[in-house]
């Protein structure tokens, strides 16, 4: 008799434990279900928080009771020691120290801020202004009071740092003086600027019409159309992705071949030769980057003809390119790699097997070009 009672009590306790485990696993429908389970028509175990809200990290709450959050990270944001704003504000790097100072620093013209820490949805809205950096990398824009000054200075700095040593088209001091004068001038007597802007707008509109009309088969090819496509190629090469500029350059080369600009007998195509009688350009120095740029153009112009001896001719061209080892400008190094690719492409299209020396020179040029790319990327400069 005692054994039967003991076994009965053991069976009852085991049944209760199994029932409780099933309730925790599947949940039971109670009359006092939480708001989340009632709205989603789920089984609720009546706990606070319930099993369903724990599983999916909902804010479990019952009617007439306080809300219970199920996120384990929520307590971090309620802690008094969790402060964002003053610490992060102190870590900012000022981009411009003085808006009236037109002289740039010697170390660097622009200092980008550190990475923006992740902002959680539980953070208070009043600290949002303290979390926002001066520069937002994902949107590529500035959004503070000195935006109109700093953003153009980036491109001015890139131009005079990389492009100006090669081409030397502008006077940096005169340009900075003129920009500062126009910036400080508060008068409205700027009729000359208005005229220039209107003329530029009409010119852009005309070029757009010419480029759009070039898609039609009824439009005859002309030098004007070729010039428009060349300008479009230069613009796309400086502003957009490489494949778009490559398409534009291919179209411009096709138009140049149709018009016959690549032939010496251009008179047969309705054009005439142009004599440059007003050349005032001075001779470039042999030690400067401009002279190295001239040498690159000479190599391109001298080694364009494919003949039976092209294998030895192109070997001489690659050897001349290999001798240009004193190039220090990253932009010129990339141009040198472009010239090597162009010459090697001509050999490939002509089905001429290159010498091993040509391949080794090409690989060495590629290595230097990759180093220049890494250098420009580390300096955040476009090329």
Curated annotation (Swiss-Prot):
The keyword Transcription regulation applies. Residues 34-60 bind DNA. Pfam families: Zn_clus (PF00172). One of its GO terms (cellular component) is nucleus. Its main location: nucleus. It comes from the Eukaryota. InterPro entries: Metabolite_Synth_Reg, Zn2-C6_fun-type_DNA-bd_sf, Zn2Cys6_DnaBD. Disulfide bonds: none annotated. Keywords: DNA-binding, Metal-binding, Nucleus, Transcription, Transcription regulation, Zinc. GO terms for biological process: positive regulation of transcription by RNA polymerase II. It is found in: Nucleus. GO terms for molecular function: DNA-binding transcription factor activity, RNA polymerase II-specific; RNA polymerase II cis-regulatory region sequence-specific DNA binding; zinc ion binding. Probable transcriptional repressor of multidrug resistance genes. This is Probable transcriptional repressor C1348.12. It comes from Schizosaccharomyces pombe (strain 972 / ATCC 24843).
